Amino acid sequence: MTDFRTLDDAGPLQGKRVLLRVDLNVPMEGGRVTDATRIERVVPTIREIAEAGGRVILLAHFGRPKGKPEPKDSLKPILPTLSEKLGRPVAFGEDCVGEAAAKAVAALKDGDVLLLENTRYHAGEEKNAPEFAQALAANGDLYVNEAFSAAHRAHASTEGLARLLPAYAGRLMQAELDALTKGLEAPARPVIAIVGGAKVSTKIDLLENLVAKVDMLVIGGGMANTFLHAQGKDVGKSLCEKDLAETAQRILAAAKEKNCTIILPADALVAREFKANAENETVTVDAVPSDAMILDVGASSIATIDGAIDEARTLVWNGPLGAFELTPFDTGTVAVAQHAARRTRAGQLVSVAGGGDTVAALNHAGVGEDFSYVSTAGGAFLEWLEGKELPGVEALRAKA
């Protein structure tokens, strides 16, 4: 993934109109930003371009306005937080193309920052319509993509635009691509992957790709129950996709063929109620009571996973090992996350994690800052793990 151009290749930025595609899809409540993480992560690139004398023109989507203006999906309420985090005023353009955009861009001086309105206010964005991409390109001299989280979508502002102007990866995109290369494309071996979450059905492609690429695969969360069921074990009232038993067996057979060691829970924390601090007990997976649910991995399984991490040099993690939102069913996820963080801090492990629940789980364990890289890109991270090409990245690669 090193064959893409970055800001280092862009030459002098003084006086250049830089169309910078960012991810500003932040949670809002009552017209205020409730979590500014995504804004904070793009600030360094905005600042770098502005300080080099570039005229920064921010392109972003927000919500799902279905190709026409929706007041609730306007980017305008983000302005105060963006200005505050950036430490400089940010102008606003009432549209991302046409006369309103052209006027706002024409008013810029070197080092100024402008946020244009939601790209999804136009149907051409999600259709990747050439004429819409050209209308966006009319306001820029070069294009920088900083939105890895939208890179799995071939939209006008992520893919079409990159074909029309000199295109570069922003610093956040660059960090993400470097981390992903270390994670799966050119990893230090052995590689261990941890895949959790509720359903096998949403992660079939992911599991099938990983068994061919990693040396050890830990399967946890609700999806592990489907594998245990496929092995003939009674999982009681646990979440289980019984209709996917054959799929699970196929994945287990593929792993065997590829010499990938599958690690499934040997014991589990079970309860009869799905609530915090429900009465619980640890049992082996051969002895799950018929009226109980598996809600976390047990102590023996935690020790096995920790031991496997000790053997590995690279870890890729997607999805929690149990119902981590409820105490004490967060024990497995927290213990394993903290163990991986210790190995990472000691320089013995490269750890890459991603996906919404995964980020929340690592933060819950207090180790969000300790992994080598934590991706905030849900869908794009998953599609990369599935081995799929990401149009937004390929468009940068094609220019190299």
Swiss-Prot record:
ATP binds at residues 203, 325, 355-358. Keywords: ATP-binding, Cytoplasm, Glycolysis, Kinase, Nucleotide-binding, Transferase. Gene3D superfamilies: Phosphoglycerate kinase, N-terminal domain. It is found in: Cytoplasm. Its EC number is 2.7.2.3. It comes from the Bacteria. GO terms for molecular function: ADP binding; ATP binding; phosphoglycerate kinase activity. Belongs to the phosphoglycerate kinase family. It comes from Methylorubrum populi (strain ATCC BAA-705 / NCIMB 13946 / BJ001) (Methylobacterium populi). Pathway: Carbohydrate degradation; glycolysis; pyruvate from D-glyceraldehyde 3-phosphate: step 2/5. One of its GO terms (biological process) is glycolytic process. It catalyses: (2R)-3-phosphoglycerate + ATP = (2R)-3-phospho-glyceroyl phosphate + ADP. Substrate binds at residues 23-25, 38, 61-64, 120, 153. InterPro entries: Phosphoglycerate_kinase, Phosphoglycerate_kinase_CS, Phosphoglycerate_kinase_N, Phosphoglycerate_kinase_sf. Monomer. One of its GO terms (cellular component) is cytosol. This is Phosphoglycerate kinase.
